[in-house]
């Protein structure tokens, strides 16, 4: 009950902010994947609706994401949208299986330094993603972005009830429409759908060849989706100082991806940027996620003419705020005080994610380096004594015996 009705006002207002911020991202991710914008937008409202009821991390926002979209490019290019929908269904099945196998518990093997590196890298990527909107533009865009940041950071001193990102979007949209400013808007990103989605089945042959085509894509999408979702859940846990059910989250991601595929949407996962917006705007319960999905549906179907007028500069200001708030500034100061090995893991995670734009590669690199570092440390904490008694030698071992410490017997 507390998850639903404990933070009604904050959840509703935060959900509205998230819904507005989701629209351009969903369109952008659709373009990356090579599909029509409505595919990403259908996912952007369907997945949050499902996650609100079944998710294991209240206040976390899931939708179509860039990491998932990148994995879909080749499949869409070679085989088309229908195979993507089929792959999204199989992705959901894999995630359901992972949830029932309790693979969410594997998150305890991800060190804090890897999580910090993941957060910092994502903050950098979020900021970098805004740069195209700030290059080769008129001075109006810079002025509106600066004004938006001013509203976001100064409005809380006047009123903390209404989320400042929402005020930023409303005010800048009003100014742009009133002054008829020549700035890029949400409508310039792509056409918004003008009708509700309908139930459909992927139009693909039900045979072994189809399975062999979609299987590798589905496996990759399932792994990346769960990895990003589990990492985001951990971050929201820290921000709200509350626990989450990782295995329930795995199952819910699977259900959500299956459902969105049956209405023509693409597979998705948790979004750290939108989750941070939600939490920082006051969202704490499941109602915030539900509100985001419902409001987004209403916006794109019934209020699309108004939504299309939102200047991208307003959303850029919101995302820059997210980037600044997401980055762990304390980790820079901790480079002097933390052990070198911990800092190396964090920096390596950041470097790989930023270089490849692939969160999974970065996290796996960080986990690998952390594991090697742990194995090296453990191998040092082993003492071997031996006693020769006639023709036999007796060894007494204190510590862990494994491949890295085996040379102590020689």
Give residue ranges: language-model regions.
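STAS-typified acidic loop motif
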Residues: 387-410
């Amino acid at each position: 009950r507390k998850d639903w009705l404990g933070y009604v006002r904050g959840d509703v207002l935060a959900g509205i902010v998230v819904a507005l911020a989701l629209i351009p991202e969903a369109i952008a991710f659709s373009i990356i994947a090579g599909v029509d914008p409505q595919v990403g937008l259908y996912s952007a409202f369907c997945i949050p609706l499902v996650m609100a009821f079944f998710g294991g991390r209240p206040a976390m926002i899931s939708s179509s994401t860039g990491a998932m979209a990148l994995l879909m490019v080749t499949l869409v290019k070679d085989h088309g949208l229908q195979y993507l929908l089929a792959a999204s269904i199989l992705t959901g099945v894999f995630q359901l299986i992972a949830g029932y196998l309790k693979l969410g518990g594997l998150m305890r093997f991800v060190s804090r330094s890897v999580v910090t590196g993941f957060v910092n890298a994502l903050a950098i990527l979020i900021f970098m993603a805004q740069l195209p909107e700030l290059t080769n533009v008129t001075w109006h865009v810079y002025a509106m972005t600066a004004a938006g940041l001013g509203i976001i950071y100064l409005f809380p001193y006047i009123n903390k009830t209404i989320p400042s990102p929402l005020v930023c979007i409303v005010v800048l949209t009003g100014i742009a429409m009133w002054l008829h400013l020549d700035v890029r808007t949400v409508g310039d990103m792509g056409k918004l759908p003008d009708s509700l989605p309908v139930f459909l089945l992927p139009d693909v042959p039900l045979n072994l060849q189809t399975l062999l085509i979609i299987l590798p894509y589905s496996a990759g999408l399932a792994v990346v989706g769960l990895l990003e979702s589990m990492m985001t859940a951990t971050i929201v846990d820290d921000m709200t100082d509350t626990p989450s059910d990782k295995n329930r989250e795995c199952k819910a991601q699977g259900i959500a991806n299956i459902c969105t595929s049956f209405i023509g949407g693409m597979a998705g996962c948790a979004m750290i940027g939108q989750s941070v917006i939600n939490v920082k705007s006051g969202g704490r319960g499941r109602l915030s996620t539900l509100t985001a999905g419902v409001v987004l549906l209403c916006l794109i179907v019934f209020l699309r003419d108004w939504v299309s007028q939102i200047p991208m500069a307003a959303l850029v200001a919101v995302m820059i705020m997210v980037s600044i708030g997401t980055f762990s500034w304390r980790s820079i100061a901790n480079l002097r005080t933390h052990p070198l090995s911990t800092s190396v893991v964090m920096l390596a995670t950041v470097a790989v994610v930023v270089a490849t734009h692939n969160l999974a590669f970065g996290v796996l690199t960080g986990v690998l380096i952390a594991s090697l570092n742990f194995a090296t440390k453990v191998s040092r904490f082993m003492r071997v004594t031996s006693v020769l008694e006639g023709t036999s030698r007796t060894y007494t071992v204190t510590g862990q015996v494994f491949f890295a410490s085996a040379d102590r017997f020689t």
